[in-house]
Amino acid sequence: MAGNREVITGSDFKRMVSGAYSEFLLEYEHINQMKGAGHASGTHILRTMGAAVLALEDARDAGIGGYAQRMATAAVFGARGAAGVVLAQLFRGIAKGLTGKYTATSSEFGKAFQYGILYAQRIVPEEPERPIITIAKSVAKGAYHAVRADLPITEILGAALQAGENSMKFVDREDAGARIMFTFFAGCLKGLDGNFVSPAISLSLGLVSGQKGMQDPREDLVRPYCVRLSIRNPKIDMEAFKKQLEENSTFALVEPHGKDVLVHLHTDHPGRVVDQAIGWGPLHEVRVTNMSESHVLGAHGALMKVALLAIAENRVQARELQDDGVNVIVSGSEEACPSVGEIVGAAHSDLAERYVLLAWSRDFHLALRQAKRLLGERVELVLACDKAQQAQAMRAFDGEKSALENAKAMREAAGIS
């Protein structure tokens, strides 16, 4: 329809992602029973989506670009499991397409969705092509033709959804990845029309109770901004100051340094933290890092040259890993994968200059690769496929060697290509 002047606002965007969350809320248990995207993929996708939507719950950006960026940042950091990492990249591409926009035309919004699908495709390079990518490509093709025709956004999403439905006959309809991609677009369309059912998170009314047996979405709140600053006040009440900072942070490291007090914390509201700190003395050397983007992380007074970081599903495994020389433990299992943010946060510790990140399940691989993308040379990966292979790798670790040398030796010892 030529001459379409429809405008998509930030409120429209909120409804769409709320609709997608709602659809996953209805479908996640069914998706959990499917194969093709790892263990408990429905739960992981729901928790990833919950982290993304929580970032918008009290956001004040009225513009669609600001909302999209907040959502993408939270999704990348809150991504769990292989499916969650793919979905987070979809959001990241959408945000890229909406950067700097207060509102978007239907065409601009449709192109942003195409960006998102492109980003999702890039994160899964394996052959043969996974069903989630097959569906994504079909959706992108359907959206492309609708965008070229300058159709309203509901018709663009409808065309994309129909293309996805048509492509389902070429893949296993019981594949979890394919169902996830289809469910996402169906939810967006319902949300835009205001037709969604009792989401656990309501962007207009605040948080309400979730389904029985479902993780409380508030526990998936991510704090993806690393704030470091110095305060010139040697007489500061350290405990009172730290307690106030912890109101808006995952942790707060507060240390005296000569006439200054050094602060290092992770938060979802860096502005609030800086505003709090202003009241305690003159600020200088303020640095805010978005940890969901690639960043250089300097080690401040690290105690070790290189450390091992691994994932433990219970206390017994955690003790065994520590006995085998693992220095940092992240809690997680195949049914409850750790988020990218939890892995990155652990590697943000000043314990070591470099880290070797270990995996004992394929379900962790994409999240660890994302951590590597964000942290760069600060970490190296050893991606085993089971606990026995991980144990073989750990026996080759040498604390006197570099992280790069260790990772190479450990992969060779365990037969990891």
Could you say what each language-model-derived stretch is?
Residues M1-S417:
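N-terminal loops that bind phosphate or other acidic moieties
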